[in-house]
């Protein structure tokens, strides 16, 4: 486990150094939070997203905010509210090595966001997504939601699904046809390892695909 942890940290550092973010792009990525639910905004569709390990904000820049923006483009911004999972979900590296590929505090935090959507926006349809460790957070959370909430979750997208092998490409106790797993060629976390390759950082490219899937699962 220590060797894997070291390899994961080294890989993150190597990829970051090899691909420095230009200043204009870095500026654009400052918008990495979405708190519509917390701010009391209810719209026909609510997207709940859990970011990947080490990402800043509560949505992250690689898959979370791009998916939120693409879904707003697909359905109209007036129809989509976005909420990231923050708080106790700190997106730190160590929980990846636990049996659930995340920790219980993160799962409880995400569960609370789904409960918030259910109580504050009872007429909204819920869609969800997660990237990297965030995909494990969503997997573990959604499978144990009470049916009254789970039945409102119309679709889920999982990018770089760290439990893809363990859970056979699906979320247990949730309809497979309502789940889209997006795994890039060469992303080794999708085949049961925690080795980070450059492919694991490419999911911004898949945000439109993910948004189209989620849009097809709801009616507005």
UniProtKB/Swiss-Prot annotation:
GO terms for biological process: carbohydrate catabolic process. It is found in: Secreted. The record marks 53, 133 as: Transition state stabilizer. InterPro entries: AB_hydrolase_fold, Cutinase/axe, CUTINASE_1, CUTINASE_2, Cutinase_monf. One of its GO terms (molecular function) is cutinase activity. The active site is at 132 (nucleophile), 187, 200 (proton donor/acceptor). Keywords: Disulfide bond, Hydrolase, Secreted, Serine esterase, Signal. Residues 1-18 form the signal peptide. GO terms for cellular component: extracellular region. Belongs to the cutinase family. This is Probable cutinase 5.
């Amino acid at each position: 486990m220590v060797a894997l942890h070291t390899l994961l940290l080294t890989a993150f550092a190597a990829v970051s150094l090899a691909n420095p973010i230009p200043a204009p792009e870095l500026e654009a990525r400052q918008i990495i939070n979405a708190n519509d639910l917390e701010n009391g905004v209810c719209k026909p569709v609510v997207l709940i997203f859990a970011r990947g390990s080490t990402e800043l904000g509560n949505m992250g820049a690689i898959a979370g905010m791009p998916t939120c923006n693409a879904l707003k483009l697909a359905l109209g911004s007036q129809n989509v509210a976005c909420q990231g999972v923050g708080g106790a979900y700190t997106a730190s590296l160590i929980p990846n090595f636990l049996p659930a590929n995340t920790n219980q505090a993160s799962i409880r935090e995400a569960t609370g966001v789904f409960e918030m959507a259910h109580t504050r926006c009872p007429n909204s349809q819920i869609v969800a997504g997660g990237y990297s460790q965030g995909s494990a957070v969503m997997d573990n959370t959604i499978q144990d939601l009470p049916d009254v909430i789970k039945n409102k979750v119309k679709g889920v997208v999982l990018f770089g699904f760290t439990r893809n092998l363990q859970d056979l490409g699906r979320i247990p106790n949730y309809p497979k046809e309502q789940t889209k797993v997006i795994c890039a060629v060469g992303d080794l976390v999708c085949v049961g390892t925690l080795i980070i390759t450059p492919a694991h950082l490419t999911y911004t490219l898949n945000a439109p695909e993910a948004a189209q899937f989620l849009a097809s699962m709801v009616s507005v």
